[in-house]
């Protein structure tokens, strides 16, 4: 069994080897992906992939705590990051209160917060109170309404400069790593080179310090929509449907159960 990652080992990976981060929402999948992942992200994406909602905004703190504990049961040797859901860190006091609640009631090793310079003060406040924080810059799913949709960042020089400012502000605030999402590859590479902490990409090219994907996307289980940045490593939906049809057919023809399945 591989040694569990720590804040220190995550930071030291910068420039040595890319970090592998995968999302999980339950014990079953957490157990399956643990051997391959350096870190498991319990993302608020569960509101879409698991709960079937249209976006992440209605995910609650209670949901995140519940699923973080489920993941921890299945992946006892993994570094687990819990997403802080929309509306739980709008100011210093609420952010600290809600972060403490997650730490006290779940097995999270760290929390992830969306935002750049605008969230640096809150991140600093959390870090100074013993909360490990992973940042998240670029395309921010929790801000899709105010942004007018999910828009790729880094297309203009102004956006490039702001992304670098965001990354440096998060690093200075005390974050141990950050996710960069939906950013032009060349700009994401510049952002990663501008800071000393790992920058983990999703839809941000290969020249960053690691990658993260949603497990149901990469396994081909989510059929409704596949983002451009997702590679399907398995046609999971087709395989599952085929297996379920075989089961249904065998039940209807009484081919199942056979003697070996009977007491």
UniProtKB/Swiss-Prot annotation:
UniProt xrefs under CDD domains: KPHMT-like
Compartments it resides in: Cytoplasm
Pathway annotation from the record: Cofactor biosynthesis; (R)-pantothenate biosynthesis; (R)-pantoate from 3-methyl-2-oxobutanoate: step 1/2
Annotated binding of Mg(2+), by residue: 44, 83, 114
Matches recorded under InterPro entries: Pantoate_hydroxy_MeTrfase, Pyrv/PenolPyrv_kinase-like_dom, Pyrv_kinase-like_dom_sf
GO annotations of cellular component type: cytoplasm
Catalytic activity, EC: 2.1.2.11
Keywords: Cytoplasm, Magnesium, Metal-binding, Pantothenate biosynthesis, Transferase
Active site: 181
Binding sites annotated in the UniProt record for 3-methyl-2-oxobutanoate: 44-45, 83, 112
Catalytic activity: 3-methyl-2-oxobutanoate + (6R)-5,10-methylene-5,6,7,8-tetrahydrofolate + H2O = 2-dehydropantoate + (6S)-5,6,7,8-tetrahydrofolate
Free-text cofactor note: Binds 1 Mg(2+) ion per subunit.
Gene3D superfamilies per record: Phosphoenolpyruvate-binding domains
Keyword Magnesium among record annotations: yes
Role this protein plays: Catalyzes the reversible reaction in which hydroxymethyl group from 5,10-methylenetetrahydrofolate is transferred onto alpha-ketoisovalerate to form ketopantoate.
Subunit structure: Homodecamer; pentamer of dimers.
Similarity comment text for this entry: Belongs to the PanB family.
Listed name of the protein: 3-methyl-2-oxobutanoate hydroxymethyltransferase
Record organism: Sulfurimonas denitrificans (strain ATCC 33889 / DSM 1251) (Thiomicrospira denitrificans (strain ATCC 33889 / DSM 1251))
Gene that encodes it: panB
